[in-house]
Regions:
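Charged DNA-binding/catalytic regions of mobile-element recombinases
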Residues: 1-288
Length: 288
């Protein structure tokens, strides 16, 4: 195991230093290295290359289950325990999301709505339930605020907007974008927290104009909107939350949301497929 680690890292660190740290002899390592590799070792080396390819493509965010699923989708047959072992040997560890942190603040003088969604985060079709919220990213020029609207069926980001200020128009822009790009009926449930951006007159008028069913979390209860909170935690781990400028942060968000997350990133809650694939499968089944 120690010699295997040295072999995998010999281009990154001096062999003699690693041998000293691991308390093995350099001569022993070179004798081990000179032996012909077994068929199993050859297979492990080829599989490790594929694993590293999947891991890099995921922005170093996939753990063993997602890596194993992606390998299977590529037609590579291997067991999950083997993937876990090779990832451990290569030091491949998925980034971990942090705890939720509340961004919006309730406006006590404005009317709110009941919690119609009531933590039912699994629905049977796209455009059945949307969830929205706001978070922020730090830049050297100041905060950049991000508002999103997610579809609960596919977990797709159907609308998003950014602003250097936390205003009512930010949330309004994200919802307007979602409504422009999606064809929705009057049976759509739209769920947010009780933040002032969501209880504002302009936002409520937009909901009313499209006859959406309004649902709001209980005051101060982030778990009532856990799906979008989880998305923000994932985004900040996979994308980062510190940028040189607001413009660069916005560009990074576009690439992450529109190119990676919506189209490629596997989501465990929808069977380890991407949001785009989840909706494509639904459309194909509906047309059959």
């Amino acid at each position: 195991m120690k010699f295997t680690f040295i072999e995998r890292n010999r281009h990154a660190h001096p062999v003699r230093v690693m041998c000293a740290v691991l308390d093995v002899s350099a001569s022993g390592y070179y004798r081990w290295r000179g032996r012909p590799a077994s068929p199993r070792q050859h297979e492990d080396r080829r599989l490790s290359i594929e694993i590293r390819s999947v891991f890099r493509a995921s922005r170093e965010t996939y753990g063993r289950p997602r890596v194993h699923r992606e390998l299977r989708d590529r037609g590579i047959r291997c067991g999950p325990a083997r993937v876990a072992r090779l990832m451990r040997q290569d030091g491949l560890r998925a980034k971990k999301a942090r705890r939720f942190r509340q961004t919006t603040r309730a406006a006590s003088s404005r009317p709110t709505a009941p919690n119609v969604l009531n933590r039912v985060f699994t629905v049977t079709a796209p455009n059945t339930a949307w969830v929205g919220d706001i978070t922020y990213l730090w830049t050297e020029a100041g905060w950049l605020y991000l508002a999103v609207v997610l579809d609960l069926y596919s977990r797709r980001v159907v609308g998003w907007a950014t602003s250097e200020r936390l205003t009512d128009s930010l949330a309004h822009a994200a919802l307007q974008r979602a409504l422009t790009e999606r064809h929705v009926g009057t049976d759509l449930v739209h769920h947010t927290d009780q933040g002032s951006q969501y209880t504002s007159a302009s936002y409520q008028r937009l909901l009313l104009a499209h006859r959406l069913t309004v649902s709001m979390s209980r005051k101060g209860n982030c778990w009532d909107n856990a799906v979008v909170e989880s998305f923000f935690a994932t985004l900040k781990v996979e994308l980062g939350d510190r940028f040189p400028s607001r413009a660069l942060a916005h560009d990074a968000l576009f690439e992450y949301i529109e190119i990676f997350y919506n189209r490629s990133r596997m989501h465990s809650s929808i069977g380890f497929i991407s949001p785009a694939e989840a909706e494509a499968r639904f459309d194909n089944e509906a047309a059959a």
